[in-house]
Design a protein with these regions (language model features):
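General structural feature for long, well-ordered alpha-helical segments within catalytic domains
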Residues: 11, 27-30, 34, 38, ...
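Generic beta-strand/beta-sheet core signal
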Residues: 53, 97, 119, 141, ...
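A charged N-terminal "starter" segment
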Residues: 1-136, 175-179, 183, 217, ...
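Charged (often Lys/Glu-rich) extended helix/loop segments that serve as interaction or gating elements
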Residues: 260-261, 265-422
Length: 422
């Protein structure tokens, strides 16, 4: 089954002349269309806001595109807060969701006026001691435990996740926070990852809406927003059907009208923290075939490796591969597509049926727009690749340069004996 890239071979050949492989390429047109569709799908909710999960793709150029559509930033670390501040996302444009949180991160989040989403009951006292007060607007992360199911399918196992408060802790947290001066409360939950179904958000929403009604009734705390977090996935495999964000939005609306409106809670804002859904399909890793090996298996070695895309090595994740210029040729060759790391799991594909690949062929590895570059690392002394934006007008723009050896050795610059040698 075909799954075609958002860029043509002709376009890519020109881009490669300016930016050598490997690099991550992003599709501005697709990003904009998707952000607009999300905004329209939840336009029925007056307070709706998407907080883009910065961890997925921490690039200010891409986040600024999303900000044109009203998106804020979901941050989970000090440097993500720094990045958000640098692009002008401060105050209620930041949702700070962290766990095992260092004191300095709470201090910085509070300084920026971010909405703080508490992961643990013990963080209430820790936060108050750290910043000297409890913010008037506060959120708590909820974990119901057990398994999360849609129909008879188990989607994930929240009971095994390190995140969030139990039901009892959540009720107690609202009471304690209210007594300490909090006035506007939020509920946050992330119960399944990369779901390719239109049912996940509506089911999660109904559960959280019912919880919100009970919380407000029993604690007297004003529930101002409900954060559905992330979890809406993308079709990595060509045979998968993409989620329909319009259907998802309508499903959440139906639950809202069934549960919150009758309870007199029609002012509750809906927040999301999508990362993969926002950018995943609109990025790809562009690499060249540089080596072939014929032993017990057929191998094609690329100039990219797991440093540039960790998901296949770490999770065994599937990423579709297109051999550019051979989109219509038969997939009659079985290959392992590898990088050059000294690790046998450095493989983008195992036993993948593809057209015959020749040295010098350009390979596009799909769906790397989220958790692609962001999960990069420097094992084996490998350097992270550049990021390039395919603009709406067809031009290509560098939005992050590739690392250099100087970057790699930069943390030794305080030692005189290495200043001139590295």
């Amino acid at each position: 089954m075909h799954k075609l890239p958002f860029v043509t071979k002709k376009q890519l050949d020109e881009i490669i002349k300016e930016f050598p492989t490997p690099f991550h390429l992003y599709d501005e047109k697709g990003i904009r269309e998707n952000a607009k569709a999300l905004k329209e799908a939840f336009a029925w909710n007056k307070g709706f806001k998407e907080y883009f999960a910065v961890k997925a793709t921490p690039n200010p150029f891409l986040i600024n595109i999303l900000r044109e559509y009203g998106c804020g930033c979901d941050c989970s670390s000090y440097t993500e807060l720094m990045l958000s501040e640098a692009i002008g996302a401060v105050g209620k444009d930041i949702m700070f969701s962290s766990n095992a949180t260092p004191a300095e991160e709470f201090v910085y989040a509070d300084k920026l006026g971010a909405i703080i989403n508490l992961d643990d009951f013990t963080h209430i006292d820790f936060l108050e001691k750290t910043i000297g007060h409890i913010p008037e607007t506060i959120s708590c992360r909820y974990n119901p435990g057990g398994f999360f199911q849609i129909s008879n399918d188990i989607m994930d196992n929240p009971g095994d996740a390190k995140y969030g408060m139990t039901t009892e802790q959540l009720f107690e947290a609202f009471k304690v926070l209210k007594a300490k001066g909090a006035k506007n409360f939020g509920i946050h939950a992330f119960l399944a990852s990369n779901t390719v179904t239109n049912d996940y958000y509506p089911i999660l929403a109904k559960m959280l809406f019912e919880l919100a009604v009970k919380l407000q009734a029993e604690t007297g705390a004003h529930v101002a927003f409900i954060n559905l977090s992330g979890g809406i996935g993308i079709p990595y495999r060509p045979e998968q059907t993409p989620n329909d964000i319009k259907v998802i939005g309508e499903g959440v609306r139906k639950a809202y009208e069934e549960v919150l409106i009758p309870a007199g809670m029609g002012d509750v804002a809906i927040y999301t923290e999508l990362g993969r859904y926002m950018l995943g399909p609109y990025g790809c890793l562009v690499t060249k075939a540089v080596h072939e090996k014929h032993t017990h298996k057929e191998y094609i070695g690329c100039d990219a490796c797991a440093v540039n895309l960790m998901r296949p090595a770490m999770y065994g994740a599937y990423h579709h591969i297109t051999v550019m210029g051979k989109e219509n040729e038969p997939c009659d060759h079985k290959y392992d597509i590898t990088g050059s790391l000294c690790e046998n799991n450095d493989k983008f594909a195992v036993d993948r049926m593809l057209p015959k690949i020749n040295i010098g062929d350009t390979l596009v590895i799909h769906d790397t727009g989220a958790h692609g570059f962001a999960m990069g690392y420097n094992y084996n002394g490998k350097l992270k690749s550049a990021e390039v934006l395919l603009c709406e007008d067809g031009t290509a723009k560098l939005i992050r340069r590739a690392e250099t050896p100087k970057d790699y050795f930069a943390t030794f610059d305080c030692f005189e004996e290495f200043k001139e040698k590295l």
